[in-house]
Structures are given as C-alpha cells and as structure tokens.
C-alpha cells in the first residue's frame, strides 16, 4: 500500500523543449469601383502566415538497475577455463601431485564494453583485487568490492544501456550519456554504430497560411475564409506497419519452386504476399492490401488468423525479400509524408428585423496535430520491436484529426433601451480521424499495438441564453442578469486515446462501438450570473454624475463597486461500472457491468461570488489619478462537496468496496495485523485526489493602475 521509509529513488530524467515560431498578419480594406452610380460594399481582407518548429529532447536513467547490469557484463569473457593449456602441479621431488590447474580462458569477442573500460581504468590506477593482487586481463573483478564513485555511466556503451529493448536508459535528442545531440542524426548513425546509437530530437514542422474576407451583400453579411495547414513530423516511419522487413508483392511473385503462380483477378500487383513457410515457401496462403486480408482464392477475410494457422509453424509468414533478415534496415523505413489540410470557414448572417432580430449560420473546419507521445517514433522502438511481443509503440504516421462544426442561431435584442437580449443556437460537430489504439494483429515479427487515426465522434448541442442589463429605475439600474442553458450529447468510438486498451487486453483488439464521450457528454448545463455594478465620475459630455447608487452620510459608498454571484450546475458525466472491486494499486481489470459508460455521476453545483471596489487617488504633478481596485473572490461559497469521480464498483467516491468483498477479506486475513492493514487502506482511500471538486476558496487582492 505504501512505500517503506527510506526507499531509494533511483530514477533520474531531464528534458528540453525549444520552440521557434514566425507569425505575420495583415489587414486591408478594398473598396470596389462604383457601378452605375451605386457604391459597392467594401471587402475587409485579412491574411496571415504562421511557421513553427519544435525541438524536443528527453533523457531518463534507471540507476538502480545498473548494478545488476554491471554484474552481468563484468567477467563474462573469462567465464571459461583454458583447458588446452593445463598447469600440472609437482612436489619438491618432481613428483606429480595429481593436481591440475587452469588459467582463465580469455574470449576477447565476448568481452563487454563495460568490462574493457572498467578493467582498463583499474589497471591504469594500479588497483588490486580482493586477494591483494594487481588486476590484469585475467583477474576476476568483483564489482561489489568497489565504491559507487568508482563507476560512471560513461563506462557503458549505448548498446549495453539499451539492453535489447529492456533499457536502463531512454533518450532522444541526447546521447546515451545525456549529452545534447545537435542536428538530425541519420538512421545509419543508429543502426551501424552500437557504441553510440544516436537518436535525434523530435523536430516537427507546422506551417499555416490563411485568408479571410468579410463583406456585405445587400443585407447579408458574409465572412469567408480558407486556412491551409501543413504538418510534417520530420521523421522516418515504417514502410509497412505489418512488417519490419520488406515483403514481396503479387507483381513480384511470378513463380515459386519453379512453378508459375496465377494470382486471383482481384489481387493487385502491389498486394503483399503471404506463404506457408518463411524460409522455404511452397504455396501462397493469402494476400494483404493495407489492413484488408484475402485468402489464396482472393476472398476477403476478417482477420489474418486463417493464414497464420495454416503455416508450418502456426506463425504468420510473409514472403520476405530476404527470408534471413532479422534486423531492420533503411529498406523497411520511409520518410514521413507531410500532411496538408485545407480548412474552409464560412459564416453569414442576415437581419430578420434590422437592428433587432438576426439569423446566422456558420461552418468551420479545424485540425489538431497529434501529440508527441503518440506520434514521435524513435528508431530504437523499431529496432528492438522484435523482442517486445504485444508492446505499445508510437505511430510516426499519425495525421491531424479533423473537426467540422456546424451552427445555426437566432439573436434578438428588445426592450425600450434595447437592454434585453435572447440567443438560441443549435450545433453539430463531427470529429474524424481521431486518435485511438489499434492492434497490428499478426504483424511480423511480432503483434504489437500502436495509435491510428481511427476513431470518430459526434457532438450535438443546443444553447439558449438571455441577458437583462441596467435593471432598475428608468432602465438605468445597477443590476445585470444573465442566464444560459446548454444541452449536449457526445458519442463516439473512443472516449480518449487509450480507451481501447481493455478491448485489446480481452482479445477483441479492433472492435469499435459507439459510446458516450466522457467529459464531453455533458447533457445539461445551467449557468446564471447576477451583477450589481455602480459607476462613478461624470459624463464627459453632459457633465452629469454617473453614480446612481445609495448615498449614506453624504458618501457615494458603492462608487466603482460591483457584486457578482455566479451559479453553475450541470449533470454528471458518464462512467463505466464494474461487477467486482479492484484493490488500489493492483494491475487488474474488472468485468464491465452493463455497457461502457452506462452510469452517470451526480449533478454538480457551485456558487461563486466576486466583490470589487475601486478607488481613485489624485497624484501631485500627474493629470491622471492613481486607480486602485480591491477585490475578494470566493469560489464555492456553500462549500458543496461535488463528486468528480467514483469507484466503478460502488459508485461512491470514498469506498471502492474491496475491503468488504470476499477477495478483500482473504487479503485482510493474510496480514500480520488485520486492523492495521484495514486502517491504512482506508487512509489510502481517503488520500486519493480528484474524487471531489475544490472546496471553498477565498482570494483577496489589490490591483494598481498607473496611467
């Protein structure tokens, strides 16, 4: 449950991000020529350009594991005896004593970089072993007999620290020792240099340019725009996500074992070919085009299991260009193809009643770049992928996700002084090419999981709002009221980028169902604001006093003062209930009860208050006064305990149900002190953050305005 006192924290990391950007924007108004004496409406043009390059570096080291690694690397080249050169023992009379000794056999090809570097260091320093003998090339070196300061990361090479994919170090933009790597190392710098294995920084380039025109045609107001976005991940990616090594295509496979091969008519020349044996193929079992699989007859199949089950060893067998290849080369990679998106924006409105009633429509397309965690594919992830069956890796080919917004609305201004308003709108948003987990089943040499632009979502909303200003005597009062309501439904195939993890773990890797989208599926949201605000000073034209509040003892007590109350309530978001509890900290998945996101959190309620009071002080020698604004801001005045999250088995924020479950009772009975374990477990439950909303908070401050 808890880390023991004195636990060693041995992980160390650092990171660095550089961002270089260029932004330019210009505006101009174009007045068309007068036609037949009629002046045509002007065009307000806006154009812009944006360039950005990020350079991200990171380095992490698991120092504790280095002690284990040193023990594995030291002395392994002298682990055998030199039996071809025995040393016979004789007594003083030259009689053989029946004792044969051997020196250690030095196998130089097995000597690790660490052993060579550390041994040379000890030899140069004249150090001795545990028996007091000077250390030489045949000495057994006990690393535990030396002090920590005798060692250093620089004694290892990159291959040893990366440890065939189970690394003690991770890095990009730095070398294996944590030194900054400038520029962009080539793939060959990693593949062909095991001592350094250089990995470049993540250096994506983003370019955008846009043009917008706003003009009026009769009583219609238009705002038309077009934005071009170019995203270049600036990295190498897998040439074929289903194989680290090049696969022959149907167009390349004409014969096999001296016999002609006739491919089905629906099989294209660029389809990948799969056979019955990796090393000695005798027949074609199927084909693949992208993610679509076909059997030998050309019939489309749902998955590639049928091919793997019919091979000689039960594993997928692509018809490799080089059947003996077991390490990735440049042929298995390609450069990222920059993605260009054209994003139109259309907005127009027309008055149903000039100055009072307006109808508007908008259409907008937006793009969002993938985050670096899902899209930055380091070369070491691919190089060691063959050793990591079922691993999750980044996808260097991720594209931007696209969101398309549609909105139609109606606005009306009314009241004697036009200080009342109403707005109603309906919206629909569609998210395409969203990011989600995807399993590459029967990839070669391993099945693995990555990210794809595969998820889809829709958000449907209705909004209504009204406001009333200057409520009071002659529509010049201090009170302003605002009320807004939103109804929103959000459904999609993934609530977040990792929402498919449970299905992948349950052997349903690429099943997509439409479910509510977590925080976006708000359903109901009501927000109201009431503000009392009094002005001060005199009207610069009429010279009348602008203060309309109460006067007490001849003082304008509420001059430059305001009181605001903001109330907000919304229905709780969805969560997924489960059929059994899971112990805190346990890596275990519980069975879903009902359907995903089939239950909802309670409603949320908050009431905030903001009080401000302004003062104006004259300053000697200054024309403008010193303005002082004092404020008190109180959030969640009623200290409402809003539930933000619950445990999926109980639906409660303070009890996960484990202690009272049969499994929990067994765990309690196995403890040395059952009561102590129970108490500590409850303390841990009560220590979880994020289960409740923020309590009442009071902030006070002063702002000074020096004009």
Task: Name each model feature, range by range.
Residues 367, 537-588, 602-606, 612-707:
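C-terminal beta-signal and adjacent terminal beta-strands/loops
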Residues 2-58, 96-141, 191-219, 331-352, ...:
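Outer-membrane beta-barrel transmembrane strands
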Residues 51-55, 217-219, 228-232, 354, ...:
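Transmembrane beta-strands of outer-membrane beta-barrel pores
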Residues 419-577:
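Gram-negative outer-membrane beta-barrel transporters
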Residues 29-44, 60, 82-85, 352-356, ...:
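Short loop/turn motifs that connect adjacent beta-strands in outer-membrane beta-barrel proteins
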Residues 351, 358-370, 374, 383-449:
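Membrane-embedded beta-barrel scaffold of Gram-negative outer-membrane proteins
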Residues 9, 47-353:
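Signature of Gram-negative outer-membrane beta-barrel scaffolds
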Residues 41-49, 220-226, 357-361, 420-426, ...:
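Transmembrane beta-strands of outer-membrane beta-barrel proteins
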């Amino acid at each position: 449950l808890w880390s023991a006192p004195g636990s060693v924290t041995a992980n160390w990391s650092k990171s660095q991000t550089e961002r270089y950007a260029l932004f330019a924007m210009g505006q101009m108004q174009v007045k068309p020529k007068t036609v037949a004496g009629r002046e045509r409406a002007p065009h307000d043009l806006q154009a812009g350009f944006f360039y950005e390059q990020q350079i991200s570096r990171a380095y992490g080291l698991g120092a504790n594991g280095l002690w284990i690694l040193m023990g594995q690397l030291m002395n392994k080249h002298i682990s055998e005896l030199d039996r071809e050169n025995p040393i016979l023992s004789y007594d003083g009379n030259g009689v053989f004593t029946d004792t044969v000794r051997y020196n250690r056999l030095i196998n130089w090809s097995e000597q690790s970089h660490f052993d060579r570097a550390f041994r040379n260091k000890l030899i140069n320093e004249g150090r001795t072993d545990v028996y007091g003998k000077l250390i030489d090339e045949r000495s057994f070196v006990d690393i535990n007999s030396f002090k920590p300061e005798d060692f250093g990361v620089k004694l290892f090479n990159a291959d040893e620290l990366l440890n065939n994919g189970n690394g003690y170090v991770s890095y990009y933009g730095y070398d294996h020792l944590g030194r900054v790597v400038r520029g962009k190392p080539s793939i060959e710098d990693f593949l062909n240099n095991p001592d350094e294995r250089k990995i470049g920084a993540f250096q994506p380039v983003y370019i955008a340019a846009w043009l917008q025109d706003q003009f009026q045609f009769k009583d219609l107001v238009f705002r038309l725009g077009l934005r071009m976005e170019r995203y270049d991940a600036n990295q190498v990616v897998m040439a074929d996500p289903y194989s680290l090594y090049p696969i022959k295509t149907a167009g390349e496979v004409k014969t096999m074992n001296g016999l002609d091969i006739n491919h089905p008519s629906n099989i294209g020349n660029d389809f990948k070919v799969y056979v019955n044996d990796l090393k000695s193929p005798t027949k074609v079992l199927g084909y693949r085009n992208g993610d679509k699989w076909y059997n030998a007859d050309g019939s489309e199949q749902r998955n590639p299991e049928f091919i793997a089950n019919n091979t000689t060893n039960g594993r997928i067998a692509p018809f490799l260009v080089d059947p003996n290849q077991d390490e990735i080369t440049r042929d298995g990679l390609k450069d990222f193809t920059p993605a260009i998106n054209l994003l139109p924006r259309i907005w127009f409105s027309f008055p149903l009643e000039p100055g009072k009633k307006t109808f508007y429509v908008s259409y907008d397309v937006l793009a969002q770049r993938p985050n670096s965690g899902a899209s930055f594919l380091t070369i070491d992830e691919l190089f060691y992928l063959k050793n990591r069956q079922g691993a999750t890796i980044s996808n260097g080919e991720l594209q931007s996700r696209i969101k398309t917004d549609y909105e139609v609305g109606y606005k009306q201004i009314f009241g004697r002084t036009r200080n009342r308003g109403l707005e109603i709108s309906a919206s629909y948003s569609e998210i395409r090419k969203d990011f989600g987990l995807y399993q590459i089943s029967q990839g070669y040499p391993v099945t693995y999981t990555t990210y794809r632009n595969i998820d889809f979502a829709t958000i449907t909303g209705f909004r209504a709002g009204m406001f009333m200003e200057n409520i009071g005597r002659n529509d010049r009062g201090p009170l302003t009221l605002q009320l807004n309501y939103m109804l929103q439904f959000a459904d999609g195939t993934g609530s977040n980028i990792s929402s498919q993890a449970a299905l992948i773990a349950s052997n349903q890797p690429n099943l997509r169902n439409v479910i509510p989208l977590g925080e976006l599926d708000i359903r109901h949201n009501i927000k109201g604001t009431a503000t009392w605000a009094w002005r001060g000073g005199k009207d610069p034209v009429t010279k009348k006093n602008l203060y309309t509040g109460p006067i007490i003892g001849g003082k304008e007590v509420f001059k430059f003062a305001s009181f605001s109350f903001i109330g907000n309530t919304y229905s709780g978001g969805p969560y997924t209930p489960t059929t059994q509890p899971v112990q805190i900290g346990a890596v275990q998945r519980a069975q879903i009860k009902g359907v995903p996101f089939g239950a909802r959190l309670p409603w949320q309620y908050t009431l905030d208050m903001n009080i401000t009071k302004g003062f104006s002080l004259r300053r000697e020698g200054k024309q403008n006064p010193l303005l002082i604004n004092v404020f008190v801001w109180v959030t969640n005045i009623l200290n409402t305990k809003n539930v933000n999250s619950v445990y999926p088995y109980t639906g409660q924020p303070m009890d996960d149900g484990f202690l009272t479950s049969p499994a929990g009772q067994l765990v309690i009975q196995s403890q040395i002190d059952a009561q102590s374990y129970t108490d500590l477990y409850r303390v841990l439950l009560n220590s979880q953050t994020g289960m409740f909303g923020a309590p009442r908070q009071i902030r006070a401050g002063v702002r000074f305005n020096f004009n």
